[in-house]
UniProtKB/Swiss-Prot annotation:
Alphabetical keyword list: Amphibian defense peptide, G-protein coupled receptor impairing toxin, Secreted, Toxin, Vasoactive, Vasodilator
Organism: Physalaemus signifer (Girard's dwarf frog)
Gene Ontology terms: cellular component: extracellular region
SS bond list: none
Compartments reported by the entry: Secreted
Described purpose of this protein according to its UniProt entry: Produces in vitro relaxation of rat arterial smooth muscle and constriction of intestinal smooth muscle. May target bradykinin receptors (BDKRB).
UniProt protein name: [Ala1,Thr6,Ala11]-phyllokinin
Organism superkingdom: Eukaryota
Family: Belongs to the bradykinin-related peptide family.
RNA-binding listed as a keyword: no
Amino acid sequence: APPGFTPFRIA
């Protein structure tokens, strides 16, 4: 996964 990737959306 790319750097800063998260499985959740950050608002």
